[in-house]
Design a protein with these regions (language model features):
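Acidic, low-complexity intrinsically disordered segments
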Residues: 1-96
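Conserved SAM/AdoMet-binding glycine-rich loop
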Residues: 83-194
């Protein structure tokens, strides 16, 4: 194992460790024409039919849930990708026949302050004319309002995962999940009303 590229907390890094310092790079859309030029099977993969292709709208999660690795993998600082770049990436995939999108964010709406970002993205998807898509995401049901729920449905949300880990507020607190079950229930009702 001495030659492996890994790091163990509390030990000196081994030679050959790969580590990328954070950079202030702006996220740009994937260039799927380029990807197809180096991976000829891309279109074969996309022709497979009913599936979701991942698109990331942001990285990071501000929460501190005791069991989750997202804050280790992506960090606690949320970095929102520019709406124009996310929509450009979706447009490229759409033009290649993709209609199913999975927003691969740790949380599509990680906190209430990101509600407007989510609304702006969904409005841009509408403005781009991507009206026959369906999409899915992980969401925290404590970070919704009625307008956002309606936009989610109007833009093709077909599936979402809400991590309601426990019906016990005490257990939610002990797991450091940071939400109120009553708020989650009320916002789930918003989603039901939105359709």
């Amino acid at each position: 194992l001495a030659g492996e590229r890994c790091y163990v907390v509390g030990e000196e890094p081994r030679p050959g460790l790969i580590h990328e310092q954070p950079a202030g790079l702006v996220k740009t859309a994937c260039d799927y024409t380029y990807i197809a030029s180096i991976w000829p099977q891309l279109d074969w993969y996309l022709d497979a039919g009913d599936f979701y292709v991942g698109v990331q709208t942001k990285r990071g999660c501000p929460h501190n849930c005791c069991y989750c690795v997202y804050t280790v993998v992506e960090g606690k600082q949320v970095r929102v990708n520019p709406v124009a770049e996310v929509v450009a990436e979706m447009r490229q995939l759409y033009d290649r026949g993709v209609r199913g999108f999975w927003f691969t964010d740790a949380q599509f709406i990680p906190a209430r302050r990101y509600i407007e970002d989510a609304k702006n993205l969904l409005r841009a998807i509408q403005a781009e004319g991507l009206s026959d898509i369906h999409w899915a995401a992980y969401i925290r049901a404590d970070n919704l309002d009625a307008e956002l729920a309606e936009l989610m449905v109007a833009t093709g949300m077909s599936y979402f995962e809400i991590g309601i880990t426990s019906g016990s507020q005490e257990l939610v607190r002990k797991m450091r999940m940071g939400y109120n079950l009553r708020t989650v229930l009320e916002n789930c009702r918003l989603l039901v009303r939105a359709g």
